[in-house]
Amino acid sequence: MNYKDIINACILSGVFLLHSPSALADTPSVGVSKGQESLQPAAEGNLWQRLIRNVSLAWNSPHQELYIPVNTWHNRWTYDDEKIASYNERPWGVGYGKYRYDEDNNWHSVYAMAFMDSHNRVEPILGYGYQKMWIPGEREGWRFGAGFTASITARYEYHYIPLPLPLPLISIEYNRLSLQTTYIPGTYNNGNVLFTWIR
C-alpha cells in the first residue's frame, strides 16, 4: 500500500466533487433545518429532471459528512480459497459528501471517496446516493434506509478509465452515525463483494 497513491486519489476525488456543472451551481438553495430541506413536490418533471434537482439540492446543502471505509467482504460462496487469501479486505481510505434529508426524511447525497481495493490499489468513486428512510416509531434517533447510488469509479486493472457503477445501498443510522453498505454483484472469482463504510 502506497500512501502517496491514497493522498493523490483523495485529492483527485475532492477536485471532481468541487467542480460541479454550471446547472447545479445556478440552482438556488432552499430553507434548511437540521439536515432537512423543504422543496416543491418531487413529482414535478420527468425522472431525469427530478434526479438533477435532487443532486442540485444535495450539492447546495450546507450539511457535510465524512466517509470512512471499514470492510470489504468477498462472498465466500463465489471465490476460491486461494483468491480470498490474496485479497485485501481492509479498504483504507476516506471520503467526503454533502447531504440532505427531504420532507419525507429520505436521504440524498453527493460524495467522493477513495480507498484501497481488493488488490491494494487506490480506487476512487464519486456519485449520488439516495435512500428511502424508515424511522421506527418508539426508537428515538434510529433510522433504517434502502436505496441506490449512481456513481462513477475507476480501477487500476482498467487503466483508471471511468466506469459507471449503479449499486444498491442499505444503512442503519443512530443520530448522525451511519453504517452504510452496498453489494457489488459479479461472477465466480470476480465481484460479489459487500463493501461497508461509516459516515
Curated annotation (Swiss-Prot):
GO molecular function, one term: O-palmitoyltransferase activity
GO process annotations (BP): lipid A biosynthetic process
Enzyme class, broadest EC rank: transferase
Entries under Pfam families matching the protein: PagP
Signal recorded as keyword: yes
Site (Role in lipopolysaccharide recognition): K83
Active site residues per record: H74, D117, S118
SUPFAM superfamilies: OMPA-like
EC numbers on record: 2.3.1.251
Compartments reported by the entry: Cell outer membrane
Protein name: Lipid A acyltransferase PagP
Species assigned in the record: Yersinia pestis
